[in-house]
């Protein structure tokens, strides 16, 4: 499958690496480079580092308002766009381009903890379980139909980092399963529409 990958932080790394092993990643979109605290050195996102190491074409747009960029994405003829912690909301013009749509890995069991910081929210709220959700992307944030979910227990000793690391690996594996279902036209939507908690 021809895939455009969109992601930025460490959480997205296993997903890009695993997808790149099994599919054709035609380009990677990540947030713009930022200067470090002293402003002397430019820091690349973890996703950009991996994309560079794998000779993948990289885009770092500030937004998706440039018609030339939208046309360039159309010309790539992606089968699918995969989003993992990208940090930008995609407009309908982008969502409508890929043959099989756009899917997103979210680090909670939707509809619980839509939006930002779901890992923190699960720990702060004392949840006994968390997990990952793969869903279709719509214009509304974290509102698309859920394709797959996988749960994991939250222990009393759980930290943000331990749960983050477990979910990023669970999510990468679940993404591959979702892509396979999409490829075989075997997707059975689990939840038709997400609602706010």
Predicted regions and their residues:
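N-terminal Rossmann-like dinucleotide-binding module
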Residues: 1-39
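Internal alpha/beta domain cores that form substrate/cofactor-binding pockets in large enzymes
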Residues: 2-4, 26-29, 57-76, 81, ...
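Short alpha-helical
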Residues: 10-11, 68, 89, 141
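N-terminal beta-loop-helix "entrance" segment that forms/cooperates
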Residues: 34-54
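Donor/substrate-binding cores of folate-linked one-carbon enzymes
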Residues: 80, 84-197
């Amino acid at each position: 499958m021809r895939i455009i990958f969109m992601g930025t932080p460490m959480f997205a790394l296993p997903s890009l690496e695993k997808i790149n092993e099994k599919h054709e990643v035609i380009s990677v979109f990540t947030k713009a480079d930022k200067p470090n605290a002293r402003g002397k050195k430019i820091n690349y996102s973890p996703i950009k580092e991996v994309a560079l190491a794998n000779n993948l074409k990289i885009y770092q747009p500030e937004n998706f308002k440039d018609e030339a960029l939208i046309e360039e994405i159309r010309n790539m003829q992606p089968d699918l766009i995969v989003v993992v912690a990208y940090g930008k909301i995609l407009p309908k013009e982008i969502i409508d381009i890929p043959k099989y749509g756009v899917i997103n890995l979210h680090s909670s069991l939707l509809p619980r903890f839509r939006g930002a910081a779901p890992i923190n929210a699960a720990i702060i709220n004392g949840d006994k379980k968390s997990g990952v959700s793969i869903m279709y992307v719509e214009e509304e944030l974290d509102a698309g139909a859920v394709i797959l979910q996988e749960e994991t227990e939250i222990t009393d000793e759980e930290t943000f980092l331990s749960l983050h690391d477990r979910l990023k690996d669970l999510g990468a594996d679940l993404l591959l399963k979702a892509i396979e279902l999409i490829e075989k036209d075997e997707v059975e939507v689990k939840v038709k529409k997400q609602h706010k908690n």
